[in-house]
Regions:
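S-adenosylmethionine
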Residues: 1-236
Length: 236
């Protein structure tokens, strides 16, 4: 069992899953977001769950038994090369990628910062960039990919997405809005690096009562001559 922080629901709300859609949760363990997708779609989404760490799959199986939510496929592929393993495309993809976890740190609890280092952040940035490139290849034209982390680091959020946008001209960001005082838009720059201005449509959640730090960005694979709107979270 685990308690899911309120911030963890935001990536799924940004994904806006619908019944009968083919949806990939690329880093699914322990299954909290997957079960929320199933709940919002009344167990009618065609869910493919994947996690690159085999030992974490057991958590998904246990949660499925507890909550009785449905999925079609469960796999154990490294997300950085998942496009080489899955021979199909999806309407929507959730990429809640592994990160340094800065959003869960508590200065009153030094143990939460035990494993943090700048080198670790830079390592994750490289892996996140590869994961984003790989999963986007599995997205249908017109489809939506939501990228999320539980860290503040621009190196793991705006930076890999900004680099990704330079090399994927068929990708665009759809603005997200959430009317909470602890929510900010994406950063414009970091150090000497200026981000793609569209990243101001991403959301940064600052820690507050009941909410950990989080980053959420909604990416669309464009189809010619079509226009798309952003998403207001927490509203019908």
């Amino acid at each position: 069992m685990f308690i899911q922080n309120a911030s963890s629901y935001l990536p799924v709300l940004a994904l806006d899953p619908k019944p009968n859609e083919e949806i990939l949760d690329a880093c699914a363990a322990p299954g909290g977001k997957s079960s929320f997708i199933a709940s919002l779609t009344l167990n009618k989404a065609k869910l493919w769950l994947n996690d690159g760490i085999k030992s974490r799959l057991e958590g998904i199986l246990q949660l499925k038994e507890l909550l009785n939510f449905e999925y079609e496929v469960l796999t154990n592929f490294p997300v950085q090369r998942i496009d080489k393993e899955i021979n199909k495309t999806f309407d929507k993809i959730l990429l809640d990628v592994q990160c340094s976890g800065e959003g869960m740190m508590d200065i009153s609890k030094p143990s939460t910062m035990k494993y943090w280092s700048l080198e670790r952040t830079q390592k994750y940035m490289y892996l996140q960039q590869k994961a984003l490139n790989a999963t986007f290849k599995l997205l249908k034209p017109g489809g939506v990919l939501v990228y999320s982390t539980c860290t503040y680091a621009p190196e793991e959020n705006e930076m890999p997405i900004s680099n990704f946008l330079k090399h994927n001209l068929d990708a665009t960001i759809e603005p997200l809005t959430l009317n909470l005082k602890n929510v900010r838009q994406g950063e414009k720059s970091f150090g000497n690096f200026t981000f793609d201005p569209r990243l101001q449509g991403a959301l940064r959640v600052l820690p507050s009562d009941g909410m950990e730090g989080f980053f959420v960005c909604r990416i669309r694979k464009k189809v010619s001559n079509e226009t798309y709107e952003g998403v207001k979270l927490g509203e019908d």
